[in-house]
């Protein structure tokens, strides 16, 4: 689809995602009761204090729920959605395709890698060229053997200070951008200096 045909587009969403890379078991006994609780409105007020201690807040796997939510956006005039769930966060090209077909929404899928805690165990073995090639394949041929192509490079997560691996991923992503012309989405860390890295 051409960008001018997308219509109203949300540019940073995660329809299905696994953010367990952020999970940690809380020290406080009162917060431990939330670890395996389902996400319901009655726990919403507690969320700022337990966001990374509650598995249901970090894992979204329900395709039917996503279809229902996306349908609301489409019915309100939405035309496009950028799903920045990158490799290591549970990116699911087949599920995104299913959601798109069920709702008629154009979904732009991401590529590349997020923060180190979400990197695959073999990331250290991959060269910059390997990562560049992988991202380009996602964009030009599709993810795995699905034929479903990524349309954005990212969300690339960064911490502060940048690790050598994060620098390698950023360089590989930049090289893939130069070759494909695909846009890039970078999520800098929370540190004040992080965006300037």
What are these regions (language model features)?
Residues 8-17, 81, 188-189:
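Histidine-centered catalytic micro-motifs
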Residues 14-60, 111-129:
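Active-site gating loops and adjacent loop-to-helix segments of metal-dependent hydrolytic enzymes
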Residues 67-82:
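Catalytic domains of carbohydrate-active enzymes, especially glycoside hydrolases
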Residues 80, 98-101, 106-183:
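Active-site gating/metal-coordination segments in enzymes
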Residues 186-197:
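Glycine- and Gly-Pro-enriched alpha-helical subdomains that act as flexible
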